[in-house]
């Protein structure tokens, strides 16, 4: 991964549910300074949020799986029920995907028909993606429910120069894994177009460690983006996504196989209007997920979401800016034809004030009015102080919530009178840069959740769990360039997550990731990465330790021309046998080769 941590300092991170997303779509190149840690833009040095960025090179190194690329970031871990296509959860600061918002080109893609509203990262492939941005900490004041741990924003491929352009990638590797992706686009002063197609297929390996048969995965996907500048003041656009995949899995420990077909589709249309000091953005989006398991207890899960949103912003003074908006969301779930639905209307605002050049303050407030239970207030305050030209201190405090899912409220095991889970989070970080060669960063975090919703065996239904769930820890990261050709990056995370004093399952206490990037020649580059995970508990009922493990990955890339490169990736070089979920396999030693051409 080429200097990921240093790029976290330099890359743009387009981040906002509306205007920020729209403006990121306007920006063709990665701006070196501008970020969105809230509704209003700011510089990376001035944001109080902790933001991580994966660009297309990082995603390529992670292979077809976006989850594998995310898992090497500080504060992030992965739990997977097998290989590509199986159920996989990304944990951020000890909290699983239930508490993580996910958006693709401004479209919310978490599944309303899931047991808990969440996104399955096991089926997210990297072929059509250009950038993945993670903003950590409770973000309910910005994004509403399901953002207690943070939000992941995904942007698909975009043209980076005027005229017609594109990119094609072909890859083949272990487990008979085949990947093909093609993107084409066009841009000029008024129009931007992008269209991407991707196909991934693999024979895979057995998901369960007790079985022997392979569990394969195949998926086709497409993404589209178009925007047109109608006048100097009005811009309109649309983004869309579609995927159709089939995942094989093990139903039991006795070679009992099964498969799930999932079709996802989404569409978003937006209009941006500029009026002097004012900016307005109107958008409507829809998302649908259709999962089918012919032999499952529940065979068909259909989840739908419709959302309408307005966001406005204005610069009140040279030091103060205000953003505000409203949105309406309706979610529906159908389980074998039995339908449930719920809606909410929200109002939100953010104010940002910079009393002096080295200090920026921001505050957010949001109110959600739900159709099924009492409304919820959530808030966030953040501060960034540039103590010196090389040192930045940032901190944030937020309150949030997770509304019970449609399945938890209305499904076959629904609980009576479920209330939203509520949370509080705090983080404090210091970042220091040593010239152009090195960076060090330390961030302490604390998140607690009350009214946790879990399945109760005593009542055979979902119920609120007494006590408090708390996750606390420390993230350390850094990078150092020994020369123009050799650099080092690394991060370590300590996490202690407990519910009423009992450790949570599948949360590593220790995670370490180190990488060395070496440009052998002007055309040949290589990356060696070592990842170590220790002290993880898992099990059913009684939690017992999983074995600690160390995984070594090696990759190399050769530039055939200025726009074409060939690459090879050797993953799990030492053929380490390990589990991230008890009883489920992970990949053994695997080799992948590919070629990528820009035109």
Residue spans for each PLM region:
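N-terminal periplasmic "start-of-domain" segments of outer-membrane beta-barrel proteins
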Residues: 30-61, 89, 223
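Extracytoplasmic beta-strand/coil segments of soluble accessory domains associated
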Residues: 36, 67, 71-108
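N-terminal periplasmic accessory domains that precede
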Residues: 66-69, 88-91, 100-103, 119-124, ...
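Short acidic/polar hinge/loop motifs at secondary-structure boundaries
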Residues: 108-136
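Periplasmic-side early beta-strands and strand-to-turn transitions of outer-membrane beta-barrels
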Residues: 140-141, 153-155, 159-163, 169-171, ...
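Outer-membrane beta-barrel signature, preferentially recognizing the C-terminal barrel domain
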Residues: 254-274, 301-304, 371-372, 390-392, ...
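Gram-negative outer-membrane beta-barrel transporters
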Residues: 354-356, 361, 446-448, 465-539, ...
